[in-house]
Amino acid sequence: MMNKIHKDNRGVLIVISGPSGAGKGTICKALLEKHDDIFISVSATTRNPRVGEVDGVNYHFLTKEEFKQRIAEDDFLEHAEVYGNYYGTPKSSVEKMLDEGKNVILEIDIQGALKVKEKATDGVFIFILPPSMEELKQRIIKRGSETPESLMTRFKSAYKEINYVSKYNYAVVNDNVEDAVKKIEAILLAEKCRVDRLKENLLESKEDEMHEQLYD
């Protein structure tokens, strides 16, 4: 009887970054709404919960002592201190979801993504690009929450961040959210078909199959 090829059912870690205004959040939201096997990682933080925020949904809220203990236990894929509070991506919860066959999205900044890349070598790193710098500028202006000074700061930062695109596996130009989502879906499908994501018994099962056909 023909043996089945056993595939690795482990999920794929998808790390998404890009400059402010590139549309990362909108793309991630669309992916989550469209696919029930894609989940977003919930970050941990030591800051106080805001009104309406739920522990384990918006963030994992920790004390500074708890956070530092997790750092000591190497339980973060990446972490940083921002304005006196700690933020990080819990390694154990991400690994649990991946082991359950769930595809996990990390929407994080570039520095965080590069730290994750050091630990998660099998991750898929996708950089979201705007169709043009002028379009990026207009998107940020439309938010209506930026002063001329902060707008210029964000724009200069975006120029610097785009230089990091070569550190990623893929670049997706977001000129249309639907098209950008389709490109990421294609990337995920291709990654699922990579030989190195199949279990080591792939060749063994094929050898057994050939042996059965030749000698049985």
From Swiss-Prot:
GO terms for molecular function: ATP binding; guanylate kinase activity. PROSITE patterns: GUANYLATE_KINASE_1, GUANYLATE_KINASE_2. Pfam families: Guanylate_kin. Its main location: cytoplasm. It is found in: Cytoplasm. One of its GO terms (cellular component) is cytosol. Gene3D superfamilies: Guanylate Kinase phosphate binding domain, P-loop containing nucleotide triphosphate hydrolases. PANTHER family: GUANYLATE KINASE, GUANYLATE KINASE-RELATED. Essential for recycling GMP and indirectly, cGMP. This is Guanylate kinase.
